[in-house]
Regions:
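Secretory N-termini
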Residues: 1-107, 155
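Serine/threonine-biased, Pro/acidic-interspersed low-complexity stretches characteristic
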Residues: 5-11, 131, 161-165
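Extracytoplasmic/periplasmic, Sec-exported soluble proteins
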Residues: 36, 40, 80, 117-120, ...
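Primarily a LysM-type cell-wall glycan-binding module
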Residues: 69-74, 79, 108-136, 140
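Extracellular LysM carbohydrate-binding repeats and other cell-envelope/extracellular binding modules
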Residues: 91, 95-112, 140-168
Length: 168
């Protein structure tokens, strides 16, 4: 799937990304600080992997790494569908402190990729559906495409990236 950009300050608060950023700055000139950074990166990657697994997307051989200096996540493994692969990328990227996701998941059932939308202040799923599909009443398509990460159609926030599937 490739590389996706995200808004670093938006998203789930799974780990202390400011602490990791400070450790990354210190690690440039200090070996013990580098060891601390490695531990923080591993803990962040584990938190992201646990979040992905909690979504029950059917991914096997999941491997997640995080680089606190750049805010980059790399995710590898086997996804059963294109939808699952895209949802994993969103699980990784819609986390505070993550700026980019390199999605290297292999997909068992490849399909066309979805479009993506960055939520801005004032957006609603109805407004987004009107923009992409020409019909505000098609917001459930977007909601379903972003479940289980979205628990309710009204629980979107500025900076969040959403999947916009092709119109069925």
């Amino acid at each position: 799937m490739g590389m996706f950009s995200f808004i670093k300050e938006a998203g789930q608060k799974l780990f202390g990304h400011k602490e990791i950023e400070n450790a990354a700055a210190a690690a440039a000139s200090d070996a013990s600080a580098q060891a601390n950074l490695d531990q923080l990166n591993a803990a962040a990657a584990k938190g992201i992997a646990t979040y992905i697994e909690s979504q029950n997307l059917g991914v096997s051989a999941l491997s997640v790494s995080f680089d606190g200096a750049t805010g980059a996540v790399t995710v590898e493994g086997q996804a059963p569908t294109q939808d699952a692969s895209e949802k994993v990328a969103l699980c990784c990227g819609n986390v505070g402190g993550v700026q980019s996701v390199n999605n290297l998941l292999a997909v068992s059932e490849p399909a066309d990729e979805s479009e993506y939308h960055d939520v801005v202040s004032g957006d609603t799923l109805s407004k987004i559906a009107k923009e992409y599909y020409g019909d505000a009443s098609k917001y459930p398509v977007i909601f379903e495409a972003n479940k289980p990460m979205l628990s309710h159609p009204d629980k979107i926030y500025p900076g969040q990236k959403l999947r916009i599937p092709a119109e069925a």
